[in-house]
Amino acid sequence: MNPEVQEKRGFFSKIPRKLKWLIIALVFNNVAIGYLLVYLTAFFPELGINAGVVGLLLGLEGAMVLLSIPLGILSDRRGRKKLLLIGTSLVPIPIILIALTINVAVLIVAAIILGIAESAALSTWNAIIADQTSIENRDASFSLSFIIGNGSIAFGFLLPTLIPTLQSLTGLSSIIIHQDLLVLMGLVSAITPVWLFRILKGYKETPNPKKLIRGKNFPTLLKFSGINSLIGLGAGFIIPLIPTWLFLKFGTPDTFSGPLLSLSNLTIALAAVASPRISGRFGLVKAIVATQGFSTVFMLSLALVPDVRLAGGLYVIRAALMNMAGPLGDSYLMGVMSQEERGLASSINTVVWRIPNSITTVIGGLILATGRFDIPFYLATIFYAISITLFYTQFKNIRPQS
């Protein structure tokens, strides 16, 4: 196709057709995960489940991404397809378990299974995208994945708005409808691995069982991941617990926080459309720094906000700005890694981000349980500012490769 014609059609026209279908296949998993997150963080507190327990479940799920490192090595050596299929196939199990009980022991088991599923998917997904793209279409590919992913999660966040209507139509209690809807979402999530299996039938990989674990770019990976982990550490104090914070501070149920998270994710998805254009104009590093920096200002403002509607508006803006940097960061890391290093690189970056995030989520839940609703935002702001400064100073002269 003529390059000028392709440019007029937009950035996303450059993405391989099969990759687009792979991105769409994850929609069913993501919708289910979206509703599950609202169920855990907004509906559980309504049932009287302590914020500390909510933080523990989220933290345990996140901690399981430690498995991403050995799974990432395995994906580089043996191939990525099987691991992705296994990970997406596990997702329905914990969702249905959580719908059927509030027994803490069972919930812990479910959180661990969900973490294992996420580890298998995260250790392969970014590498699969990078393997099928070049420097010309990589930013657009990661952005489309980010947009579709966040849009489908947003749909899951929105589902609690249906519950009052379903109550009036069926006469069932809110608790039963919440639970039945989560079971339905678990069943819907099973569509993803079936669809992926069909799409990936002809996907060819070249296993490299003798490949060295540490490649030439390993020091760069450790530096990038270490700095990025400070974002994860700061975010953990409050971001996964936003619905819990809204309920405890303002008394808002999931019929408010669910749509707010949905609006936030839709805004994030729309904002990510601009990500490739911003990086094309200013460069990846400057684009990442600018979006994260402006987001941090809005993060700080949430510590002092007195009104729930204002809090919702500020949170949406903060989320959109911060997450515009998400696909750009993924694209940047995959661009500075060789093809043979990408599975491990994606895994290490995920683990180093999620482990601190998981720990501080538990701490954040405990802080919220004491009634100190501002401290988590102050802590998050400090770590964001340190990470953004270090990222710019360390990576401003390092360019991605094809």
What are these regions (language model features)?
Residues 8-65, 222-261:
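Helix-loop boundary and gating motifs at the non-cytosolic
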Residues 56-73, 262-274:
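Central cavity-lining transmembrane alpha-helices of secondary-active solute carriers
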Residues 67-79, 271-284, 368-369:
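Helix-to-loop junctions at the C-terminal end of transmembrane segments
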